[in-house]
């Protein structure tokens, strides 16, 4: 019997008198086939260390620990720590850290892996309410995670993996795809969770690029420009950029020159631009002193 088997999950929760906290976005997966697919998608073996976020009662952790060199699981809810000590007692390669992943010194914790030089993959069922902050925090942390295989709200997975000229494409797509390739591996129906969420989930696989997708002069400025370009989706690039940089004649003149240099029409919308075109635009705007 697996931790994720519904009868086992129910028994564990009852034995420990556990009640779900909405503020932590807790939804426990009770489908062993899906858990197996997640671990297979992540290609976990004994030459990989794994960071897990939000292990819950250890359903996914169990599958990870059977194959990984080590698993370090970060759980914010202190009530789950004794439950995890119970459900994962047979594994000596799992460390549970009762910390908020957004506040912890991750670089320091990673040194506690027995072999910190092994590749590190992030595999997690992320809480919906904080998916994007956690992802961007990890991607921008400077820690060389080679891969992320994470469960999230399907809508967010679609936005992250979206391509230009689609409804889902936006600044989040650009922010992630600058660093990683991103592809939806498979869909997870809401019916396999306890309690069931209101929407379906998706497993998103992200692999770190050896180098960023495009070369830019100033990364922070590149992200600011891409974000500004999607402020109002139905507005043109010109309207969004004048809204961000200002509408003085001097600014308009610089914007006109930058757009011309980047080979872009003022009437185009942000959703039509590729990463390379955003890179060219950002560098041209920077060159104009904006």
Curated annotation (Swiss-Prot):
Gene Ontology MF: a single term: RNA binding
GO cellular component: cytosol
Reactions the enzyme catalyzes: adenosine(1518)/adenosine(1519) in 16S rRNA + 4 S-adenosyl-L-methionine = N(6)-dimethyladenosine(1518)/N(6)-dimethyladenosine(1519) in 16S rRNA + 4 S-adenosyl-L-homocysteine + 4 H(+)
Keyword Methyltransferase part of the UniProt annotation: yes
Pfam families from the UniProt entry: RrnaAD (PF00398)
UniProt record similarity statement: Belongs to the class I-like SAM-binding methyltransferase superfamily. rRNA adenine N(6)-methyltransferase family. RsmA subfamily.
Record-linked NCBIfam families: ksgA
Protein name per the record: Ribosomal RNA small subunit methyltransferase A
Source taxonomy: Bacteria, Bacillati, Bacillota, Bacilli, Lactobacillales
Name of the encoding gene: rsmA
């Amino acid at each position: 019997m697996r931790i994720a088997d519904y009868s086992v999950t129910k028994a564990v929760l009852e034995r420990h008198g556990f009640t779900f906290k909405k503020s932590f976005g807790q939804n426990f997966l009770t489908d062993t086939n899906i858990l197996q697919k997640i671990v297979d998608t992540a290609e976990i073996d004994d030459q990989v260390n794994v960071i897990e976020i939000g292990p819950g009662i250890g359903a996914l952790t169990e599958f990870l620990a059977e194959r990984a060199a080590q698993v370090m699981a970060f759980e914010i809810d202190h009530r789950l720590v004794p439950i995890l000590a119970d459900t994962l007692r047979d594994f000596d390669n799992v460390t549970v850290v009762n910390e908020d992943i957004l506040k912890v010194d991750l670089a320091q914790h990673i040194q506690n892996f027995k072999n910190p030089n092994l590749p590190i993959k992030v595999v997690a069922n992320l809480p919906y309410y904080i998916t994007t902050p956690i992802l961007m925090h990890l991607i921008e942390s400077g820690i060389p995670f080679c891969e992320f295989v994470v469960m999230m709200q399907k809508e967010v997975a679609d936005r992250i993996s979206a391509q230009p000229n689609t409804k889902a494409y936006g600044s989040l797509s650009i922010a992630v795809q600058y660093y990683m390739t991103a592809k939806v591996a498979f869909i997870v129906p809401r019916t396999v969770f306890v309690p069931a969420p209101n929407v379906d989930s998706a497993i998103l696989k992200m692999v770190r690029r050896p180098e960023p997708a495009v070369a830019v002069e100033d990364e922070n400025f590149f992200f600011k420009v891409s974000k500004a370009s999607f402020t109002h989706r139905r507005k043109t690039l010109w309207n969004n950029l004048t809204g961000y940089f200002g509408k003085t004649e001097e600014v308009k003149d610089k914007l006109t020159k930058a757009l011309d240099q980047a080979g872009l029409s003022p009437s185009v919308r942000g959703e039509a631009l590729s990463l390379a075109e955003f890179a060219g635009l950002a560098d041209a705007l920077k060159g104009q002193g904006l």
